[in-house]
Amino acid sequence: MVLKSSEFNPDFPKQIIESGEWIFGDHASSFQKCYQCGTCTGACPSGRITALRTRKLIRSALAGIDSILSGDDLWMCTTCYECYEKCPREVKITDIIKIIRNIAAEKGYIAEPHRKTSLLVFKTGHAVPVNDEIKKARLAIGLTEIPPTTHKYPEALEIVRDIMEDLNFCKKVGICRETMDLEPLNVQKSEE
């Protein structure tokens, strides 16, 4: 695949660093140490069953190829930290992927499964709501049927929802409080 010069954003690596510094500190610039050995890709369990190539994501970030923001690969990472632990250059790959995801989300690019999980958190307070099977499993290991979370204390769910709205999370993900459903996202195209 041949790329045109118009497909490169020379400010993209800097944008990644600046977007992530306030959370990850110096780790936000660690991707600049990557020498493309491929250890991360070899270690990635998601990459064994999906098209995710961690090394390619990092290479694209370094090269300023910001089209990765709209791609599916960015959302295939399970954040297991296997690449993070194996990297010989101590590139904080999982953190870099989280930073790039945040940039993508700001522009309206969020994988649909992630949006649906966010909606579950908004509706129930949980990414994986308690069902009958989970209740049985909890009882079998000596726990109460309902965990001491929003399932047991439904009044806390409104607090969770308020926090999500106060952080503009609902707007970014496209959650409508009135319909309790997802709305289409407004995608911000890069300036060309």
Swiss-Prot record:
Its EC number is 1.8.98.5, 1.8.98.6. SUPFAM superfamilies: alpha-helical ferredoxin (SSF46548). InterPro entries: 4Fe4S_Fe-S-bd (IPR017896), 4Fe4S_Fe_S_CS (IPR017900), CoB/CoM_hetero-S_Rdtase_csu (IPR017680), HdrC_iron-sulfur_subunit (IPR051460), Helical_ferredxn (IPR009051). The keyword Iron applies. Residues 25-54 form the 4Fe-4S ferredoxin-type domain. One of its GO terms (cellular component) is plasma membrane. The keyword Plastid does not apply. Its cofactor is [4Fe-4S] cluster. One of its GO terms (molecular function) is 4 iron, 4 sulfur cluster binding. [4Fe-4S] cluster 2 binds at residues 44, 77, 80, 83. Binds 2 [4Fe-4S] cluster. Keywords: 4Fe-4S, Iron, Iron-sulfur, Metal-binding, Methanogenesis, Oxidoreductase. PANTHER family: IRON-SULFUR-BINDING OXIDOREDUCTASE FADF-RELATED, IRON-SULFUR-BINDING OXIDOREDUCTASE FADF-RELATED-RELATED. Part of a complex that catalyzes the reversible reduction of CoM-S-S-CoB to the thiol-coenzymes H-S-CoM (coenzyme M) and H-S-CoB (coenzyme B). The heterodisulfide reductase is composed of three subunits; HdrA, HdrB and HdrC. B1 and B2 subunits are interchangeable, as are the C1 and C2 subunits. The heterodisulfide reductase forms a supercomplex with formylmethanofuran dehydrogenase (Fwd), F(420)-non-reducing hydrogenase (Vhu) and formate dehydrogenase (Fdh). NCBIfam families: CoB_CoM_SS_C. Belongs to the HdrC family. This is H(2)/formate:CoB-CoM heterodisulfide,ferredoxin reductase subunit C1. It comes from Methanococcus maripaludis (strain DSM 14266 / JCM 13030 / NBRC 101832 / S2 / LL). The lineage of its organism: Archaea, Methanobacteriati, Methanobacteriota, Methanomada group, Methanococci.
